[in-house]
Amino acid sequence: MALERTFSIVKPDAVERNLIGEIYNRIEKAGLRIIAAKMVHLTEEQASGFYAEHEGKEFFQPLKEFMTSGPIMVQVLEGENAIARYRELMGKTNPEEAAAGTLRADYALSMRHNSVHGSDSPESAAREIEFFFPESEICPR
């Protein structure tokens, strides 16, 4: 097993409903460590930069509007096979298809308002972590 890092977002719908602590608890119970975290309210420019790979897709503008609608929590998670483990904890993007007991099955309101984001590959994890966190803000433990 490989020790790796992944990137996670607690999205505006979950922050608004005061689910940060519950989600963090579930992350830690899954054996992942939170090694960096902060609350931010994305600007449109930041959202455009973060989601640049989706520019031109039909959901790009609604996604940006949602992700700038309120504060989010961004965090770096570390653990054995962190990317796969966190994606399993999140569940499928569509909460109706997410397995019982996953974050999206338990907390998501819809496909768009699905409470959490997690990196899907080591490459995206590295890019997403770097977007929000300089190495000096990451505290391995």
Curated annotation (Swiss-Prot):
GO biological process, one term: CTP biosynthetic process
Cofactors: Mg(2+)
Signal peptide positions (record): none
Class of this enzyme: transferase
Predominant cellular place of this UniProt entry's protein: cytoplasm
Enzyme Commission code(s) on record: 2.7.4.6
One protein family per Pfam: NDK
Alphabetical UniProt keywords: ATP-binding, Cytoplasm, Kinase, Magnesium, Metal-binding, Nucleotide metabolism, Nucleotide-binding, Phosphoprotein, Transferase
PROSITE patterns found in the cross-reference section: NDPK, NDPK_LIKE
Protein location: Cytoplasm
Binding site for ATP: 11, 59, 87, 93, 104, 114
Any GO CC annotation of this UniProt entry: cytoplasm
Transmembrane segments: none
Catalysed reactions, semicolon-separated: a 2'-deoxyribonucleoside 5'-diphosphate + ATP = a 2'-deoxyribonucleoside 5'-triphosphate + ADP; a ribonucleoside 5'-diphosphate + ATP = a ribonucleoside 5'-triphosphate + ADP
Family the entry assigns: Belongs to the NDK family.
Task of the protein: Major role in the synthesis of nucleoside triphosphates other than ATP. The ATP gamma phosphate is transferred to the NDP beta phosphate via a ping-pong mechanism, using a phosphorylated active-site intermediate.
Assembly, per entry: Homotetramer.
Protein name as catalogued: Nucleoside diphosphate kinase
Species the sequence originates in: Vibrio parahaemolyticus serotype O3:K6 (strain RIMD 2210633)
